[in-house]
Amino acid sequence: MFHKRKIDMIDFQILSILQKDATLPVKDIAKKVGLSNTPCWTRIQKLQELGVIKRKTAVLDPEKLGFNNRVFIFIRTNQHKKEWADKFKKYILNQRQVIGLYRISGTFDYLINVLAKDIGDFDQFYQNLIENIEIYDVSSSFVMEVMKENTEVPIQTLD
């Protein structure tokens, strides 16, 4: 939902450029979309104010930083009260190894995406999890090969 302001094609072009390289100077972005600097800068500011641009960040390579294991943890709970969900969410969000937390449909209730340096590092995470949070069932899958990973939103398909 885009709230108070309609996103136009120039905004989509700006967003596409920023997704690929958020370090580009405004003057370079403006040139690519056919605007002068000030209107381009204003559009970027508005997109940030609307929350369309959440933040500008660097994408790091986990393996080059020693995180050689990516693990998806599937959690099933038999506790569906707000108190349990709040405790679970607070605990998981405070774990530095967690790079994603999702409430999902299907057989499991939650999916956690974790980076671990090795099996021992993951086991420590797992042991702490089951010690601190009452969980009905847990299943973990280690990523064998990353075949595609992308942070870009496919905005060229948005209407």
Positions of predicted regions on the chain:
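A compositional/biophysical signature of low hydrophobicity enriched in polar/charged and small residues
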Residues: M1-D159
